Curated annotation (Swiss-Prot):
Subunit structure: Component of the small ribosomal subunit. Mature ribosomes consist of a small (40S) and a large (60S) subunit. The 40S subunit contains about 33 different proteins and 1 molecule of RNA (18S). The 60S subunit contains about 49 different proteins and 3 molecules of RNA (28S, 5.8S and 5S). Interacts with ribosomal protein S21.
Swiss-Prot/TrEMBL keywords: Cytoplasm, Ribonucleoprotein, Ribosomal protein
Its biological purpose: Required for the assembly and/or stability of the 40S ribosomal subunit. Required for the processing of the 20S rRNA-precursor to mature 18S rRNA in a late step of the maturation of 40S ribosomal subunits.
A cellular component annotation (GO) from this entry: cytosolic small ribosomal subunit
Compositional bias annotation for Low complexity: 234-247, 261-289
Organism annotation: Suberites domuncula
GO terms assigned for molecular function: structural constituent of ribosome
Protein name: Small ribosomal subunit protein uS2
Main location, first listed in the record: cytoplasm
Length: 325
């Protein structure tokens, strides 16, 4: 289908994405109607889907979706958890109506119930697990587009897109490619520029992993806020001018440490400056502080410890006792 137009041909980047996601790997069981999409079988019995036929069916499905005037008349459905996030993203960008999770029987056939809808086109993620909406769509003549694996039955399916719909990366990539092609056919995005939306947004994510990532981000944010608050509350060290510091310590600015501070007496108005006295007043003990007399030479002569009035130790004789013991 896309061999005649260069614009619709499959690019190398698209082939790399399909092979990296494992879209070409089918199920070990092959339905007789899906055998036409199998390229060959590996030695371990796994069939390999022809990627070129996958791309051609993808373009056909995108043309069918773009032909619907009202995007809300397109219903996308996924019963498996792997495709629920993908259909929600597809509905967000294309304007389709999503049904994620369990399909309520009678949604397309029972007009009494509140959830009754009449879509013009139905797109399902798995032809085997979504058999109930496919059957109801056949009752009311709603065309069906389905992502089919090699073991999927093709009954009541109008456009089958062969791919690996069992892997979360493969199914998310197929929804991303279909969404991009629909937007290109509508003229919303250009073919010359890459789409800014990454395929990772269409991939399934485990709720437990998402919760752990959110907790880790919240913990990191709390630590960052605590660090910023601690740094904000710390007072800055006062920076004092060196000249002011020298004045408070009694050291002249720009002088040596050994120089004594010079104090200038105030000059009385209208007279000569006072003459400083040249006679030094001896320091006296005022009861506290330094006393010069403590360091002066004593005026009285003191005796040695061993000296006696009688002379040396050896020349002294004991005095005779004058009385009895």
């Amino acid at each position: 289908m896309s061999g005649g137009l260069e614009v619709l041909s499959m690019k190398e980047d698209d082939v790399t994405k399909l092979l990296a996601a494992g879209t070409h790997l089918g199920d070990s069981n092959v339905d007789i109607q899906m055998a036409q999409y199998v390229f060959k079988t590996k030695g371990d019995g796994v069939p390999i889907i022809n990627v070129r036929k996958t791309w051609e069916k993808l373009l056909l499905a995108a043309r069918v979706i773009a032909a619907i005037e009202n995007p809300a008349d397109v219903c996308v459905l996924a019963n498996k958890p792997f495709g629920q996030r993908a259909i929600l993203k597809f509905a967000h960008y294309t304007g389709a109506f999503p049904i994620a999770g369990r399909f309520t029987p009678g949604t397309f056939t029972n007009q009494i119930q509140k959830a009754f809808r009449e879509p013009r086109l139905l797109i399902v993620s798995d032809a085997r697990s979504d058999h109930q909406p496919i059957t109801e769509a056949a009752y009311v003549n709603i065309p069906v587009i389905a992502f089919c694996n090699t073991n999927s039955p093709l009954r009541y399916i109008d456009v089958a897109i062969p791919c690996n719909n069992m892997g979360k990366n493969s199914l998310g990539l197929m929804w991303w490619l279909l969404c991009r092609e629909v937007l290109r056919l509508r003229g919303t995005i250009s073919r010359e520029l890459p789409w800014e939306v990454m395929p990772d947004l269409f991939f399934y994510r485990d709720p437990e992993e998402v919760e752990k990532e959110e907790q880790a981000k919240a913990e990191a944010e709390r630590e960052r806020l605590a660090t910023d608050q601690w740094q904000t509350n710390q007072p800055a060290a006062p920076q004092q001018d060196p000249d002011q510091w020298a004045d408070t310590m009694g050291v002249p600015s720009g002088g040596d440490w050994g120089d004594e501070p010079v104090t200038t007496a105030p000059v009385p108005t209208g007279g000569a400056p006072p003459v400083a006295s040249t006679t030094a007043t001896p320091a006296t003990n005022t009861g506290s502080g330094f006393n010069q007399d403590d360091w002066s030479v004593p005026t009285t002569k003191t005796k040695d410890w061993g000296a006696d009035d009688g002379g040396e130790w050896g020349n002294t004789e004991p005095k005779a006792s004058t009385g009895n013991w």
